[in-house]
């Protein structure tokens, strides 16, 4: 049976036109929702009810970057609702006035940052430093994208020298980012802490990969084992990432396919890959706030290759506690100069006393899982604790109960309703899949919360679906730039 991606509506031109049409026909519904929110919003208990300062401390200016993404928007809303400080925001924009976060009630001012030009990060770095200086920022909370993490680390060091000791940043320096973000460097670092890691090999050529796979095949025959690997780009490579769950080596009668597959990945010294042992088990991700080497807030949840549904694991579960302890060990090892957002991806093997967790990736930046803290007032205090470490709480903050699952309705409408229905109409789907996905969609709408929408702050939701994404789809059509998938929460389009 053909997969949905091979059907006509998944081709470049039809899918962009269909998504533009979806945005257009849903506009009246969204407009009614916004109208209702504007009327109700000012009286909503979730509005910007500032917490008054009782200690007489001066009002501080807090800059949050990355507010086009759900994670940045979530943090500005927390700070706006539960502190009385001056919250401003900054982000890059494909076109002027298209950033969803620009229109949030949670910020007092928005600055447009220059995008990196042809791989040159200097314009971005200069524009961000200019905002930090001109606004006399006291606290910068960085919500980097994958591409901007190292650059934000460079900015942090420069800003500390320029603005002095009173300036604080929730952002690791570039050395820490490189050590944690680069998959091969991460493996070496975690191993040096005495923690277990999957077998990994840094590869800079196809023959190098083939030699390792050949040796593995021989070992598998001799020991009757079935060790397999996955091949992942160390840097950012959307095309390779879409194929990275391909298990290697292939069967013996598929050796030609293995060679063909490897040659398609453009492995080279300038584009290295990591060949990582495939561990059978469920995947989980974490998000934590670290200040001066101490984990202040932590949450974990089930994960996937592109996570669009978030549900927190129970705080007292063995798995959650193991991942927290792992994160604390890394943070404590880095010491007092280590402040930022720290997120890990794990594979869990076994259960109970036999449970093993294998770190497979680290994101030294904010994770979208921070949305699970949306109702947690103490999270705002955790950020402010960087100004007064003696007043900070000793216990790790977890999401406030009752916890909710989070979804993005734009993603679910397409993946749970439209794609199964169109596949059925094309004779390539099953009616059972349509009904099953429709039930899941209804459960999300009635029991979960949308990651972007806030009744007291509805405009980012409107702009996301009726300005930002339509602009991206039009840009894709005009430039003929194809994409394989999109992440609504991070506003990222993956090239194909």
Predicted regions located by residue number:
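Conserved metal-phosphate-binding beta-hairpin within the catalytic cores
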Residues: 288, 332-372
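Phosphate-binding site of ATP-dependent enzymes
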Residues: 253-310, 315-323, 347-359
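Flexible, glycine/charged-enriched surface loops at secondary-structure junctions
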Residues: 274, 337-343, 396-401
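Glycine-rich phosphate/pyrophosphate-binding beta-alpha loops
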Residues: 239, 304-315, 363-377
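Peripheral (often C-terminal) accessory segments that flank ATP-dependent C-N-forming ligase machineries
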Residues: 26, 50, 381-496
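ATP-grasp fold ATP-binding core
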Residues: 190-191, 198-200, 214-244, 267-281, ...
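ATP-binding N-terminal substructure of ATP-dependent carboxylate-amine bond-forming enzymes
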Residues: 1-171, 210
């Amino acid at each position: 049976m053909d997969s949905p991606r091979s059907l006509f509506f998944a081709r470049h031109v039809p899918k962009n036109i269909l998504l533009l049409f979806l945005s257009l026909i849903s506009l009246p519904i969204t407009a009614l929702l916004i109208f209702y929110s504007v009327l109700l919003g000012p009286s909503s208990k979730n509005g910007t009810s500032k917490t008054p300062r009782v200690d007489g401390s001066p009002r501080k200016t807090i800059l949050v970057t990355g507010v086009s993404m759900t994670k940045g928007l979530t943090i500005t809303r927390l700070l706006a609702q539960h502190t009385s400080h001056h919250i401003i925001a900054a982000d890059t924009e494909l076109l002027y006035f298209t950033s969803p976060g620009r229109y949030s009630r949670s910020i007092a001012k928005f600055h447009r940052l220059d995008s990196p030009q042809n791989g040159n990060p200097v314009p971005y770095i200069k524009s961000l430093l200019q905002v930090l200086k001109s606004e006399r920022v006291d606290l910068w909370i960085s919500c980097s994208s994958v591409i901007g993490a190292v650059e934000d680390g460079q900015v942090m060091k420069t800003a500390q020298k320029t603005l002095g000791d009173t300036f604080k940043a929730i952002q690791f320096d570039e050395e820490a980012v490189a050590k944690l973000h680069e998959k091969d460097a991460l493996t070496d670092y975690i191993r040096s802490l005495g923690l277990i890691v999957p077998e990994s090999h840094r590869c800079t050529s196809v023959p190098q990969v083939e030699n390792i796979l050949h040796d593995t095949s021989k070992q598998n025959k001799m020991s009757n084992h079935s060790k397999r690997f996955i091949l992942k780009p160390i840097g950012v490579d959307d095309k390779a990432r879409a194929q990275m769950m391909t298990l290697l080596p292939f069967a013996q009668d598929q050796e030609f396919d293995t060679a063909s597959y490897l040659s398609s990945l453009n492995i080279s010294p300038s584009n290295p890959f990591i060949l990582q042992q495939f561990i059978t088990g469920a995947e989980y991700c974490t998000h934590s706030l670290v200040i001066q080497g101490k984990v202040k807030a932590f949450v974990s949840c089930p994960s996937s290759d592109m996570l669009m549904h978030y549900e927190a694991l129970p705080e007292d579960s063995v798995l959650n506690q193991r991942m927290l302890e792992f994160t604390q060990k890394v943070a404590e090892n880095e010491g007092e100069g280590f402040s930022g957002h720290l997120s890990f991806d794990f594979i869990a093997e076994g259960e109970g006393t036999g449970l093993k967790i294998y770190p497979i990736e680290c994101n030294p930046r904010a994770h979208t899982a921070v949305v699970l803290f949306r109702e947690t007032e103490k999270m705002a205090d955790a950020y402010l604790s960087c100004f007064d470490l003696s007043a900070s709480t000793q216990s790790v903050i977890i999401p406030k109960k009752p916890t909710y699952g989070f979804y993005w309705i734009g993603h679910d409408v397409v993946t749970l309703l439209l794609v199964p229905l169109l596949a059925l109409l094309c004779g390539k789907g099953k009616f059972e899949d349509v009904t099953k996905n429709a039930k899941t969609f209804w459960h999300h709408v009635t029991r979960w919360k949308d990651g972007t929408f806030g009744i007291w702050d509805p405009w980012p939701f409107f702009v996301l679906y009726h300005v930002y994404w339509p602009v991206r789809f039009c840009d894709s059509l005009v430039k003929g730039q194809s994409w394989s998938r999109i992440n609504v929460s991070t506003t990222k389009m993956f090239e194909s």
